[in-house]
Curated annotation (Swiss-Prot):
GO terms for molecular function: rRNA binding; structural constituent of ribosome; tRNA binding. One of its GO terms (biological process) is translation. Binds 23S rRNA and is also seen to make contacts with the A and possibly P site tRNAs. Belongs to the universal ribosomal protein uL16 family. GO terms for cellular component: cytosolic large ribosomal subunit. Residues 7-16 have a biased composition (Basic residues). This is Large ribosomal subunit protein uL16. InterPro entries: Ribosomal_uL16 (IPR047873), Ribosomal_uL16_bact-type (IPR000114), Ribosomal_uL16_CS (IPR020798), Ribosomal_uL16_dom (IPR016180), Ribosomal_uL16_sf (IPR036920).
Length: 138
């Protein structure tokens, strides 16, 4: 699973996920991409589950790029603990996703195979996505 090797600070504020993605909004590495049109958070487990679904479908052909990285820690308190007494420990890492962000890219496969692989991957993600092609303008 993806997570930072080390961070400057262990915990972060929750923050607000607003605006549209300006960086990482174009397909830059592969020929096909999976773009988010919804807003939300992707955990490292969800990112990995989608990657596995794509990899299994395209078998040996093609190459996949993961364009997002979970760098925001989400803390949580243990079960049955009273409120207060400080912030909980970091439990997992998430990537904040704005609409327009390209999540995955693929190359070296035909369009039908890429579409089906991205459809399987999108089923693992908690937001709406759309299939994009590089030369048609992402």
């Amino acid at each position: 699973m993806l997570q930072p090797a080390r961070t400057k600070f262990r915990k972060q504020h929750k923050g607000r996920n607003t605006g549209m993605a300006t960086r990482g909004a174009k397909v830059s590495f592969g020929e096909f991409g999976l773009k988010a049109i919804g807003r939300g958070r992707l955990t490292s487990r969800q990112i990995e589950a989608a990657r596995r679904a794509m990899t299994r479908h395209i078998k040996r052909g093609g190459r996949i790029w993961i364009r997002i990285f979970p760098d925001k820690p989400v803390s949580r308190k243990p079960a049955e603990v009273r409120m207060g007494k400080g912030k909980g420990n970091p439990e997992y890492y998430v990537a904040e996703i704005q609409p327009g962000k390209v999540l995955y890219e693929m190359d070296g496969v035909d369009e039908l195979l890429a579409r089906e692989a991205f459809r399987l991957a999108a089923a693992k993600l908690p937001m709406q996505t759309v299939f994009v092609i590089r030369h048609l303008g992402s």
